[in-house]
Design a protein with these regions (language model features):
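Conserved hydrophobic beta-strand signature of PAS-family and PAS-like sensory domains
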Residues: 70-71
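PAS-family sensory domains
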Residues: 124-130, 137-140, 143-144, 155
């Protein structure tokens, strides 16, 4: 009597499918974000902004008016911070800052935005539960067709897992 050999399938194939699934979900979320932003920005929306959002690896998007009050956040904002859209809208993103947030970074951020410049950097923020997280931010000014500042968009990534030195 011959013994049959058992064939064991590696989990690599499962991981491959899981990665593809996660990539597909990210793509759907990005398309949803792009659609929402496009409908809000009307005469300010450009293909450059679409490309930037689609290419960037982000956890949250925050859209503010020119006075830096939040007018829209994506679903990832709640996942990253613990705060709901309803709570965030109308507030300035500085509500996420706290005692350990660098004064130097806050000053640099204020100065760049005061001159309608872009800002790229990392800042320590606080989640709703009080937990610190390191947030990589890329902020872009958005102008209308008359080249007047209308909005800022912050493309944010939680870098806490990559840098635990705070």
């Amino acid at each position: 009597m011959k013994r049959s050999k058992k064939i064991i399938s590696p989990l690599a194939s499962f991981n491959y499918h899981l990665e593809n699934y996660n990539g597909l979900i990210k793509s759907f979320r990005k398309n949803k974000d792009i659609s929402h932003i496009g409908s809000m920005l009307n005469d300010c929306y450009t293909s450059e902004l679409t490309s930037k959002i689609f290419v960037e690896d982000y956890d949250a998007l925050v859209l503010t008016d020119k006075s830096q009050k939040i007018v829209w956040v994506n679903d990832g904002f709640n996942d990253m911070t613990g705060y709901t859209k309803k709570f965030a809208i109308g507030k300035k993103p500085s509500f996420l800052q706290g005692e350990k947030t660098s004064e130097k970074v806050k000053k640099q951020l204020r100065e760049e935005l005061a001159f309608n410049h872009t800002f790229s950097g990392s800042i320590l923020n606080y989640r709703k539960n009080g937990e610190l997280y390191l947030c990589k931010i890329n902020i872009l000014p958005i102008y209308n067709l008359d080249e007047k500042l209308k909005y800022f968009i912050a493309i944010e990534k939680d870098e806490t897992k990559m840098n635990q030195s705070f």
